Amino acid sequence: YDIERAGIHSYRYRTKNPMHLLEKIIRKRKENYAKFEHINKSNYHKYITDLIGIRVFFLYREDWIHFHKFITSMFENDPNNYVEDRLRDFDEDPEHCYIAERPKVYKRSGDTRIYDSTQIEVRTGGYYRSLHYIIKYHGYYLEIQGRTLFEEGWSEIDHDIVYPYYKDDEMLTEFSGLLNRLSGMA
């Protein structure tokens, strides 16, 4: 497989900012204490699945299948490896690289039905659109997200303007929803 056959137009990557990591740990522990009760400085990498984030961009949503075939050819995709308990199920072998959760796609209600639910878990509802793959890679989890360039553009604007400050602004929320629907047409 090469990057073009995988349907990838471009990509970005980042490592999690330490302050954002700390905020996320505090938030997660507050939201679900039982699940995150034992998280600490020596095991947080077993809980946090996006210490490293890679976002790939497609021109067309239909390109998802090419990327899915690419990623499942690069990493073992065995449901027996899917992590349920972050501490118990963590594979300590740093050389064992695999898909650690069932691949998911978040789509909006009304989106065309291009996803094959036998290959990827389909979650519908809300405005969020993205493919998600959690990969165990050399002792750490990394998250790979995939979306179209249009979906990324809308998401960046929404996250920059609406999300942090104006979630309750009816006009901005309506405008953001319109942009979301338009981005989904590509």
Please report, for each region that a protein language model flagged, where it lies by residue:
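Surface-exposed, low-hydrophobicity interaction/linker segments
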Residues: 1-37, 94-97
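Residue-level detector of functional hotspots within protein domains
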Residues: 7, 40-42, 117-119
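Surface-exposed peri-terminal alpha-helical interaction modules
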Residues: 32-33, 37, 41, 45, ...
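Long beta-strand-rich cores associated with HINT superfamily self-processing modules
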Residues: 45-47, 52-53, 57-186
